Regions:
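Active-site helix of classical SDR
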Residues: 126, 162
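Conserved glycine-rich Rossmann-like NAD(P)H-binding loop of the short-chain dehydrogenase/reductase
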Residues: 34-51
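Residue(s) in the substrate-gating loop at a strand-loop-helix junction
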Residues: 146
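Conserved NAD(P)H cofactor-binding loop of Rossmann-fold oxidoreductase domains
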Residues: 94-99
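Substrate-binding pocket helix/loop in short-chain dehydrogenase/reductase
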Residues: 102-103, 107-115
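Conserved glycine-rich cofactor-binding loop
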Residues: 13, 20-22
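C-terminal helical subdomain
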Residues: 186, 204-240
């Protein structure tokens, strides 16, 4: 795998949340391929250790697995304890929560949990690690958002609103932290081939575009933070659609495809 990331700038350790599967797992793998040790955080500790063992064998880096539920109050204390002795050069705040459905029918607890994971966790993680990165005068923060985050998606009203927060938060931080030598990138993928797709869509086969691979999403995200781009929308077609397709058309298309 081609080396894309400056490990002297973004290493020796990275923290990746939501690292047990999907984009987070692949980001952990590609960071390790660039010689960076990885703290992998998620709820499923057995799966984390399995993924970490594979990364350690393949790339000869170190890993540390942290079992944590980002929807729980006080989660940040577990992260602090797990990383206190490490020099974290890159925060990858990837974990997210989403459930499709008509807003009036969704459980209030699920809605609160989505905000806890998709908004509060990003904020608390950055608030803890950003001062340390500023003190280092190098490093980076990658926040995982979503393509079209500012549109507002029917049957994903709450999750899409939280992704709009991630976009605004990340682009503001990019401006604030750049002068301190800290890169900030919002990685905003479109529909990606992960286990989440069947959970959200009535018929994944009816999606009228090819799903992105996690490998492409991770690689473009890593290249973007190396270049300190404020926003990365992976895939040329997705970038084109993000620029030119009206939000009203996106809403209608997604409303037909998502589970109610």
């Amino acid at each position: 795998m081609k080396q894309l990331l400056d490990k002297d700038r973004f290493g020796p350790w990275a923290l990746v949340t939501g690292a047990s599967s999907g984009i987070g797992k692949e980001l952990s793998r590609q960071l390790a391929a660039n010689g960076i040790n990885v703290v992998m955080a998620a709820r499923r500790i057995d799966l984390l250790k399995e993924v970490g063992d594979g990364i350690e064998r393949e790339f000869s880096v170190e890993f540390r697995a942290v079992q944590v539920d980002l929807s729980e109050e006080g989660f940040i204390d577990k992260i602090k304890d797990a990383t206190r002795d490490l020099d974290i050069g890159l925060l990858v705040s990837n974990a997210g929560a989403a459930r499709a459905g008509e807003f009036v029918n969704l459980a209030l607890k699920d809605l609160h949990d989505q905000i806890s994971v998709n908004v509060v966790a990003h904020m608390e993680l950055v608030r803890y690690f950003a001062p340390r990165l500023v003190k280092r005068a190098r490093g980076g923060v990658m926040l995982i958002g979503a393509m079209g985050a500012s549109h507002g998606i029917p049957y994903m009203a709450n999750p899409s609103a939280t992704k709009a927060y991630v976009l605004a938060f990340g682009e503001a931080l990019h401006f604030e932290l750049e002068k301190h030598g800290v890169a900030v990138t919002v990685l905003a993928p479109g529909l990606t081939d992960t286990a989440v797709i069947p959970e959200l869509f009535v018929d994944p086969g009816a999606i009228p575009m090819k799903l992105l691979s996690v490998a492409q999403v991770a690689a473009e995200g890593i290249a973007a933070i190396q270049a300190n781009k404020s926003l990365c929308v992976p895939g040329a077609l997705n970038r084109f659609m993000n620029r030119v397709v009206p939000a009203s058309i996106t809403r209608k298309m997604m409303a037909k495809l998502l589970k109610k």
